[in-house]
Design a protein with these regions (language model features):
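Bacterial N-terminal signal peptides that target proteins for export
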Residues: 1-8
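Short, linear, compositionally biased motifs with a strong N-terminal bias
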Residues: 12-13
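N-terminal signal peptide c-region/cleavage motif recognized by signal peptidases
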Residues: 16-18
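Ser/Thr/Pro/Gly-biased, low-complexity, turn-/loop-rich segments
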Residues: 2, 20-175
């Protein structure tokens, strides 16, 4: 196998992984989505921020709870509900414009919330936060992931993938 073939295969793998991740992504409060109903400008919205309950208000349908649903599932829900007396054959597209932020604290130079980017690893998240302080441990990293009802604490490494809503804490190292 040539170097060129290996590079092409690697690029395809990365692209397919990020596409799969986007398809599996579950919406929650703080996400910003766009809804496009083809041919229906009054039902198309370029930017909707999900409220604290993970919901948004939509014409004719009222409050739509998107929390825990994938963008594809929200498309199907809106399509089904618009077919019920409003449109004959609605074509709906839902896409994520901005993911909810992740949070990083502890021994980083600039702790706080940062915008999530698909494929973000912990080492890149640390770089976004200005890098590690002099006292930081690159081995004592905890990551809290999950919803309000079920939160999991994970011992993380620098190659761990970060997800939207994650809370990362970098502990001090022992010298």
């Amino acid at each position: 196998m040539s170097v060129r073939q290996i590079m092409i295969a690697a690029m395809l793998l990365v692209c397919s992984a990020s596409t799969w991740a986007a398809a599996q992504y579950q919406l929650s409060s703080g996400d910003t989505i766009a809804i496009n109903v083809f041919g229906e400008n009054d039902l198309t919205f370029k930017e909707i921020v999900l409220n604290d309950a993970g919901a948004f208000s939509y014409p004719f349908l009222g409050e739509v709870v998107a929390k825990g649903m994938t963008p594809t599932a929200v498309e199907q829900l809106i399509t089904t509900r618009l077919k019920d007396g409003y449109l004959v054959n609605p074509r709906v597209s839902v896409s994520v414009l901005k993911y909810r932020p992740f949070f990083i604290g502890g021994e980083v130079k600039l702790p706080g919330g940062y915008p999530f980017q698909p494929g973000l690893t912990l080492d890149r998240a640390i770089a976004l936060a200005g890098g590690l302080t002099e006292r930081a441990s690159d081995k004592r990293i905890t990551l809290v992931r999950g919803s309000d009802l079920k939160r999991n604490e994970i011992k993380a490494t620098l190659s761990t993938l970060v997800e939207p809503g994650d809370t990362i804490n970098i502990d001090q190292g022992f010298f």
